[in-house]
Amino acid sequence: MTTVIENDSQKSGRLEVGTPLLEVKDLHVEFHTRDGVAKAVNGVNYSVAAGETLAVLGESGSGKSVTAQTIMGILDMPPGKVTQGEILYRGQDMLKMSNEERRKIRGRKIAMIFQDALSALNPVLSVGYQLGEMFRVHQGVSKAEAKAKAIELMDRVRIPAAKERVNDYPHQFSGGMRQRIMIAMALSLQPDLIIADEPTTALDVTVQAQVMDLLAELQAEYNMGLILITHDLGVVADVADKIAVMYEGRRGEGGPVADNYKHPAHPHTRRLLDS
């Protein structure tokens, strides 16, 4: 059993230069089904530091989203089960934390942007109510204060006429605007790390670029770590510092983006480049 001792930088909330914000170490996740055991993640390792962007690449079924859901603590268990490994946030293994400890990290310290904003947002609640809920739950502010903060967030992610649109519902926004609402929701409590799971898949090329530029700008402003999950190498070429290529639940290769573009070692990476 590993004993973790907090140092002064952890107590103060600061990390030493070069210290990973999040580390995934030898992670194994499997699903128990009627047909047997399906191994979804097989010994994945990667890390991300404050202000750094890690792109996790892979096709459907590669295990990239299962890894992200395990980090967030939102994977259904059962049927899912972590059989081995560590997920270290600021040196603390989240897999050994209680549900209450994980809940305090989720949203406050590590937030997630989901692929399908329309499904992730509640269709019967206004976007202002959903944005404000983060402040009401975690900060105990009044409804009026929560609404004001929601408008500020909508302005921050450049949703036009935020004050007039705060009471609108998700279906009244375009796909690009809904994704901006998801970004605003993730940013609401100024987390250390954001995990963006295919955040631009359903958007056209122009809107994709706008969303990625916005994410990069906000990341730099708040010095957040960013894990960008995607199957599209073109999306990450200009924003990622390093990549981790996943294939059949394993990390095929990784490292600085430029090195992997110029000298891809794994066949799957070459296929992604050619696609």
Predicted ranges, named:
Residues 1-274:
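ABC transporter nucleotide-binding domains
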